[in-house]
Amino acid sequence: MKLLSKTFLILTLTFFFFGIALAKQSFEPEIEALKSFKNGISNDPLGVLSDWTIIGSLRHCNWTGITCDSTGHVVSVSLLEKQLEGVLSPAIANLTYLQVLDLTSNSFTGKIPAEIGKLTELNQLILYLNYFSGSIPSGIWELKNIFYLDLRNNLLSGDVPEEICKTSSLVLIGFDYNNLTGKIPECLGDLVHLQMFVAAGNHLTGSIPVSIGTLANLTDLDLSGNQLTGKIPRDFGNLLNLQSLVLTENLLEGDIPAEIGNCSSLVQLELYDNQLTGKIPAELGNLVQLQALRIYKNKLTSSIPSSLFRLTQLTHLGLSENHLVGPISEEIGFLESLEVLTLHSNNFTGEFPQSITNLRNLTVLTVGFNNISGELPADLGLLTNLRNLSAHDNLLTGPIPSSISNCTGLKLLDLSHNQMTGEIPRGFGRMNLTFISIGRNHFTGEIPDDIFNCSNLETLSVADNNLTGTLKPLIGKLQKLRILQVSYNSLTGPIPREIGNLKDLNILYLHSNGFTGRIPREMSNLTLLQGLRMYSNDLEGPIPEEMFDMKLLSVLDLSNNKFSGQIPALFSKLESLTYLSLQGNKFNGSIPASLKSLSLLNTFDISDNLLTGTIPGELLASLKNMQLYLNFSNNLLTGTIPKELGKLEMVQEIDLSNNLFSGSIPRSLQACKNVFTLDFSQNNLSGHIPDEVFQGMDMIISLNLSRNSFSGEIPQSFGNMTHLVSLDLSSNNLTGEIPESLANLSTLKHLKLASNNLKGHVPESGVFKNINASDLMGNTDLCGSKKPLKPCTIKQKSSHFSKRTRVILIILGSAAALLLVLLLVLILTCCKKKEKKIENSSESSLPDLDSALKLKRFEPKELEQATDSFNSANIIGSSSLSTVYKGQLEDGTVIAVKVLNLKEFSAESDKWFYTEAKTLSQLKHRNLVKILGFAWESGKTKALVLPFMENGNLEDTIHGSAAPIGSLLEKIDLCVHIASGIDYLHSGYGFPIVHCDLKPANILLDSDRVAHVSDFGTARILGFREDGSTTASTSAFEGTIGYLAPEFAYMRKVTTKADVFSFGIIMMELMTKQRPTSLNDEDSQDMTLRQLVEKSIGNGRKGMVRVLDMELGDSIVSLKQEEAIEDFLKLCLFCTSSRPEDRPDMNEILTHLMKLRGKANSFREDRNEDREV
């Protein structure tokens, strides 16, 4: 019995230990696979794998992150957010029972092992947020059980293969934020169980597969941040379970399919940052569950459909950066769940919706860059959750509502670039503001004290208002301030020394005020300051030494103050400077050579001072990287121009004019191949103008070497300057002939050669065709066909006739003279008879007129038919002298018919009509309205036929509904057109033709908005002459009040200077959008437009900018633009001088405009550098 028991025990133990050994052997591959996984980990900072050690049996199932089934096989490896670093071992394939592999948010690198395709039981592969690279292993697509594939946020590359469509079990696919390329497979629609497909942030191309529209179970689709093209498939309207559709930041085009309105489950619709066009579909109003609709940054047109205001679940509505139009409906107040509303950068008009205050959950409201008018709601303070209110760049008026102080959570307030008035309300200190920008308005009064209680404020811009008072010492409390802009106001007093407390300040703009005194030494505490503009104040004294401790300073503008003394050598410490302007002060002494350390300068202006001595060569050599502007003009500098100037190979503008430089132009200057403008005028330079210097300067627009002592011939290389617009060589000692090559420069509009010793023939083509005689005077040996030049004669050998021959010639000459007398008597007799006949029937002379004019003579009936019997509906302009009708000839030609008012014309003016019609038909210039023909019937009709101008007249463009001419360059271009036409009238014909009624209504714009001067013959047809005489029987022709020159209104004297006056008024009107009469100043005193402009310039740049039209004023972003506009307005005042002899001629005006155009065309400063925030 004992033996039996002992045997049984031995057998039991034997089977037990055999079972253990067998179990250990069956799990060994999985354990080894896990060990290999652990060996692939190079860093385990949290020690999560420290328990991966064999102790006893089956212990691997208890390791961190491991889950086994009931038989002990590993079915899940889940190691989320464990900070593991390393590679994924291919041995993972030996976990043959593995169903879930989740390595979310670690730092695995290398490729995903191809062996992973052997895990036939795998249904979830989650490798989200790692650094896996390479392509997606093809074996994954053989995993028949996988339904959850998440590879987001890795570095995977390659295409999405067609094989993905074989894995029909997939429910979720996540490819977000990798480097995948190629097209989305068209067969994606075969994955019938797919609920989520997200592939944002890759480089996918091609169109969106239409087959996606068949995925009935799809709830989430995100393809944002790729380069997808084509249209949004209309089949998406079949996705009734779709909850989130995100296609943002692609290149999609076409319209938003109305069919999306069928996706009744949609909660989120994001289509922003594409190139979508067309209307916002009204059908989107059917998406009653929609919470987020963001379709901003597209090219959508139309108004906001009223159906959108039914989406009461909306929390986010983003329609900004489109081309949407119309008013913002008061129905916006129905969207009471709205938290974020962005409508900025559209073309919305109408008044600010008062119902906006119903949106009590609103945190962000942006409506900037529109044309919204009206006032902000008085109860704006009801929006107590508001954090961001941005309504800049609109047409808002009225005050800032005082209730805004109830918006205690408000952090950002931007109301800049509007027309708001009143004082800045108190209560700002109650809010949590970090950003305040209310510049470019009409706010008055002082900066309220409690604004200085905004202790978190980082940006404060109150620039370009009518603020008065001082900048108070309380400013020192805003110690988090980074940007402070108070420029373009009327602040006075000293700059407070407490400003030195603002140690985080990056930008400080104090310019264009009335600050006085010295720069406070405490400003040296602003060691983080990068931009400092204090120009156009009344600051004085020397620059304090402490200021040069601001080592990060990049922009420094101290121009137009009263600083004196020498330019401190300590400027050399400001090695980060890229922009330095000391222009318009009282600095004296020499230019410090130590400034050579300022090697990063792009703009350097020390003009208009009292500087003496020479330019240090080493300074110029250090500026070799300068790209924009070097100006040392209007000083007392001497010596030669340093050869080192040639080191500035990238500079665009050099001005050394009005100094005392001597010697010759350095040959090294030829290296400055990028220069646009070069001015060495008004110096003592001499020698030949070196031909080789200018051979490579083919970018130059303006070259001025006038008022020097240059000798020799004009270089032939000037003829190679294919962009040259203005060339001034006047007042030198140049000799030789004028190069014919100058006549071939099509761009050359202004050429001055006066006061030299030039000789020979003056070319007759190109710029010489319309050159002013005054620009050639002082060259006694020049000849040509243009008056008052003497004609070029060819000397011939003397002829010697015999005595007999001379007698014969005398007899023949006498006989010829007798015949000529008889012929003249006969002609006079015929003329008297003809004159008598004309009295009975004046029409008898018209055939001769037809012949003389070489114009088509229209029958009055033709014009009646073309204008529908001169229907009043076709009137496009009228005055006391004429009415202009739009008409259409039988051949389809659209014309303008100018019918003269016979009551205002004497009978004697008939003969002037013939004479002047003949004269006017011979005028040919691209900026004059061409005369196509005429119609005449004694006592009934007197009309001119003109081409029809598609864009109307300048009057409508400035004051009417026509598209405005906004930019400075566009305005200058228009003035150049007008001036060119008038200059041709004044000096391009055999005798001057005075317009006498120049005004915006008489300037027409063609389809390309090129200006054409019209009505330039009316005065002559009436019989007015330059001497003031007239044959008109009435005083009908009295010009237009406001544009009429004083001497014409009172003396009836007609000269070209009368047109110059009118042109000056037109230029002012174009810049200000103010009519020339019925203006009032701030004291309600009557004033003219000229007085308004003159007063504005007298008030400094702040006043000047304020008088400009808003669009132009808002476009000013740099000091150079301000200076160009100031020059333009000064030219206007010059043109409108009360004495005619003080006004320039039209050629001089054209020259000045071309120079201004060159400046306006070459502005290169960054738009944000001088723009008020």
UniProtKB/Swiss-Prot annotation:
It holds the Pfam family LRR_14. The chain crosses the membrane at residues 807-827. Residues 1-23 form the signal peptide. It is found in: Cell membrane; Endosome membrane. Disulfide bonds join C61-C68, C165-C187. It is an enzyme of class 2 (transferase). One of its GO terms (cellular component) is endomembrane system. The modification Phosphoserine is found at S869, S906, S938, S961, S1035, S1084, S1115. The keyword Transmembrane helix applies. Residues 828-1173 are cytoplasmic. The active site is at D997 (proton acceptor). Residues 870-1155 form the Protein kinase domain. Changing R294A: Abolishes flagellin-binding. Belongs to the protein kinase superfamily. Ser/Thr protein kinase family. Constitutes the pattern-recognition receptor (PPR) that determines the specific perception of flagellin (flg22), a potent elicitor of the defense response to pathogen-associated molecular patterns (PAMPs). Flagellin-binding to the receptor is the first step to initiate the innate immune MAP kinase signaling cascade (MEKK1, MKK4/MKK5 and MPK3/MPK6), resulting in enhanced resistance against pathogens. Binding to the effector AvrPto1 or to the phosphatase hopD2 from Pseudomonas syringae blocks the downstream plant immune response. PANTHER family: LRR RECEPTOR-LIKE SERINE/THREONINE-PROTEIN KINASE-RELATED, LRR RECEPTOR-LIKE SERINE_THREONINE-PROTEIN KINASE FLS2. This is LRR receptor-like serine/threonine-protein kinase FLS2. It comes from Arabidopsis thaliana.
